[in-house]
């Protein structure tokens, strides 16, 4: 098992851990905390009020999102061996404790031990300096269904970079029905009204809003295929992993972290709408079991924790030099 440690995880004060709907980073913190505790480590989590975790939870003050550093310093337990900061403000403060900064987005931070969520982000944002650990999920939480229903699924925030309009065009190109599930943030309202809403007919193209919990799992596990036609270099992209954990195939545009998450199934990636339609029409996908096993082997919470543990020990060793 190795040396047992006292580990602090730092979340942002925006979304609770674990999240109800949107919140990939918070889901990572949830799974990483559980796995570290299962391995005998002591884990303390600073997170938004309303969060729930297997370890000790230290909730941030209510309605406070700025300058949380004094609160963390004041409430930091004695004897902490290492900090994993998913928010950035603790790592940038350079406290006298080994600190890994888990970087989930294309945001530049001056930290000593950066850990990016993908090799793509490490190279693009970190210029190759630092490390990367892929996100992982608790595959056992995702229902596995072999017999799929006859609908396509577009899951995620409805903004131009997620390519919801391409999912609509792909469905119209094949005649398949499409369910669009996701929230429309402020920056996506104009896009939704122009590119998405006019196509919603309640029959072939349905929009059901943001989903979470059992409803999200049911959609992911029953969909014939999940479409992920992103138009930007997304750092990681959790939806393909979640879908494949349910045994559901994904067709994705070759952008950003998709080249890593879909590395085992290059035949399901493409560069444009026409090829996406062709793949759908071909209707030849890997077996549901093969998709799920791929996630277990490469993107499970256990694999993520293995990789974090290696970097934790490396960070502690380097700090002591």
Report the location of each language-model feature.
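A short, well-ordered alpha-helix in the C-terminal region of glycosyltransferases
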Residues: 285-301, 307-310, 314
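Short alpha-helical segment that forms part of, or immediately flanks, the ligand-binding pocket
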Residues: 217, 240-245, 259-260
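Donor nucleotide-sugar binding/catalytic pocket of nucleotide-sugar-dependent glycosyltransferases
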Residues: 105-143
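Short hydrophobic beta-strand element within catalytic cores of glycosyltransferases
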Residues: 249-252
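Conserved acidic donor-binding segment of nucleotide-sugar-dependent glycosyltransferases
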Residues: 263-274, 280-285
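A short alpha->beta transition loop at the rim of the catalytic pocket in nucleotide-sugar-dependent
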Residues: 224, 246-247
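Conserved donor-binding/catalytic core segment of Leloir-type glycosyltransferases
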Residues: 128-181
């Amino acid at each position: 098992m190795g040396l047992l440690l006292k580990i602090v995880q730092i979340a942002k004060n925006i979304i609770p851990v674990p999240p109800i709907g949107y919140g990939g980073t918070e889901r990572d913190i949830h799974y990483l905390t559980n796995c570290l505790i299962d391995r005998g480590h002591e884990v303390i989590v600073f997170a938004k009020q309303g969060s729930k975790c297997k370890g000790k939870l230290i909730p941030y003050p209510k309605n406070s999102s700025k300058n949380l550093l004094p609160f963390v310093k004041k409430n930091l337990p004695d004897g902490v061996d290492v900090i994993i900061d998913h928010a950035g403000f603790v790592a940038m403060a350079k406290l006298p404790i080994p600190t890994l900064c888990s970087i989930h987005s294309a945001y530049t931070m001056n930290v000593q031990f950066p850990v990016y969520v993908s090799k793509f982000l490490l190279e693009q944002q970190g210029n190759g300096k630092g490390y990367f650990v892929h996100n992982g999920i608790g595959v056992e939480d995702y229902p596995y269904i072999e017999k799929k229903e006859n609908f396509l699924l577009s899951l995620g925030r409805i903004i131009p970079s997620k390519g919801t309009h391409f999912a609509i065009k792909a469905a119209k190109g094949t005649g398949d029905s499409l369910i669009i599930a996701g929230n429309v943030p402020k920056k996506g309202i104009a896009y939704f009204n122009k590119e998405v809403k006019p196509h919603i007919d309640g029959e072939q193209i349905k929009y059901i809003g943001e989903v979470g919990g059992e409803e999200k799992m049911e959609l992911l596990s029953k969909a014939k295929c999940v479409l992920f036609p992103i138009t930007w270099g997304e750092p990681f992209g959790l939806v393909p992993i979640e879908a494949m954990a349910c045994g559901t195939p994904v067709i994705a545009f070759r952008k950003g972290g998709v080249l890593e998450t879909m590395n085992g199934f290059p035949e399901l990636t493409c560069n444009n709408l026409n090829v996406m339609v062709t793949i759908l029409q071909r209707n030849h996908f890997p077996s549901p079991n093969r998709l799920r096993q791929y996630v277990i082997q490469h993107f499970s919470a256990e694999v993520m924790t293995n990789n974090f543990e290696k970097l934790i020990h490396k960070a502690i060793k380097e700090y002591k030099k």
